[in-house]
Amino acid sequence: SVAINQYTGEVLALVSTPSYDNNDFIRGMSSEKWNALNEDENKPMYNRFRQVWCPGSTFKPIIAAIGLTTGAIDPNEDYENEGLSWQKDSSWGSYHVTTLHAYEPVILKNALIYSDNIYFAKAALKIGERDMESSLTKLGFNEELPFDIKVAKSQFSNTDKIEKEIQLADSGYGQGQILVNPLHMACIYSAFCNEGNMIKPYLTYKEDAIPNVWITAAFTKDAAQMVLEDTKEVINNPHGTGYAACRTDITLAGKTGTAEIKASKEDTTGTELGWFSVFTTDENMDRPIMIISMVEDVKGRGGSGYVVKKDSQVLEKWLSDN
């Protein structure tokens, strides 16, 4: 998990669990303990917040903002109901994009509320390979994060470009070859709160810190505002996938995600990553917070719903201590 102040860039927490006691290294460690740490299947020495991960549906607000910024997406265009399975045409062979919920009208706001894979696959095709690549490059993909701790670079492809139409479509809902670092994800989401500008994160506490922008005009102001309003609906609309985190005292925004990690569409043995990106939306509150959480192996544990519950507990503690 990563927690930041999305308006200043102050990093509030970087968490990787399971973990280990750093003091054991200072005092000296027996070979038995060292071997136990190294051989633990839960990998306590693997620093998860420094890695890149498949983001699943938490990527959809980013695609929405890219589509709105480039003009490829008309937020009021009805993509029409295709059922729960869709392919562009027969050139895709047996490959279909699947989704979980049917709803009407099939417009951007509803697609985010219901987390519609088919809508965002179509949106990605409308954006196109080259504009997708240039937009993600502008957001800092394939680039070092300007931060005190070195983290892995986010990527949109295993090569330097999106090679195939199906890969482009899958990228629209955070699958394909998309891999994102959680802190980088927080920086991108910060643009929804800062009129389209991505905040630069910092680690060391500063009194009355002046926010530094990492990427100016990552999205247009209008695009950022629309995605902000739509991600509020994800949490506050009873049909929203993040509704379990809804609060009556403050307005939250965010997006859930369940990323499938498997060898092929037919693979039933793969695992799932559960994601929840959630943030406060009142710039004037005392202690604003944005939390980006990813939990490995949530298959059979409720997918992203498992992470929503965890983050809701953290938010409750943070806000009650405020």
Go through the PLM ranges and name each one.
Residues 210-212, 308-322:
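Short, gly/Ser/Thr-rich active-site loops of penicillin-recognizing serine hydrolases
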